[in-house]
């Protein structure tokens, strides 16, 4: 019996659609990012799934707020993945 799908060599597109625990090689989906404050342009390192409010050290502006999963960036903040 021949399978239509190769289970040992899945395509990257099919691996991206799977749940994080069902992938062939488990990998985390969280990351650290550099967030730039829109007011004073200070860069702060923030975890993508932060569970507390992150405030800018320079001007005390809220950079991101926690949700149930990923943290929501404040409007106007730009970020870069590390």
Swiss-Prot record:
Key word Ribonucleoprotein present in the record? yes
Q: Which UniProt keywords apply?
A: Cytoplasm, Metal-binding, Ribonucleoprotein, Ribosomal protein, Zinc, Zinc-finger
Paste the cofactor note: Binds 1 zinc ion per subunit.
Molecular function terms from GO:
RNA binding; structural constituent of ribosome; zinc ion binding
Residue spans annotated as Zn fingers (C4-type) read 37-59
What are the subcellular locations of this protein?
Cytoplasm
Tell me which cofactor or cofactors this protein depends on: Zn(2+)
Q: Which Pfam families match?
A: Ribosomal_S27e
Bridged cysteine pairs (disulfide): none
- What family, per the record? Belongs to the eukaryotic ribosomal protein eS27 family.
This protein's assembly is summarised as: Component of the small ribosomal subunit (SSU). Mature N.crassa ribosomes consist of a small (40S) and a large (60S) subunit. The 40S small subunit contains 1 molecule of ribosomal RNA (18S rRNA) and at least 32 different proteins. The large 60S subunit contains 3 rRNA molecules (26S, 5.8S and 5S rRNA) and at least 42 different proteins.
Role noted for this protein: Component of the ribosome, a large ribonucleoprotein complex responsible for the synthesis of proteins in the cell. The small ribosomal subunit (SSU) binds messenger RNAs (mRNAs) and translates the encoded message by selecting cognate aminoacyl-transfer RNA (tRNA) molecules. The large subunit (LSU) contains the ribosomal catalytic site termed the peptidyl transferase center (PTC), which catalyzes the formation of peptide bonds, thereby polymerizing the amino acids delivered by tRNAs into a polypeptide chain.
Report the protein name in the record: Small ribosomal subunit protein eS27
Organism of this sequence? Neurospora crassa (strain ATCC 24698 / 74-OR23-1A / CBS 708.71 / DSM 1257 / FGSC 987)
């Amino acid at each position: 019996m021949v399978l239509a799908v190769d289970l040992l060599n899945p395509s990257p597109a099919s691996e991206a659609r799977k749940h994080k625990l069902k992938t062939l090689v488990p990998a985390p989906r969280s990351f650290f990012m550099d967030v730039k404050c829109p007011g004073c342009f200070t860069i702060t390192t923030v975890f993508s799934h932060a569970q507390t409010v992150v405030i800018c050290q320079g001007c005390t502006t809220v950079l991101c707020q926690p949700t149930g999963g990923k943290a929501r960036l404040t409007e106007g903040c730009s970020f870069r993945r590390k």
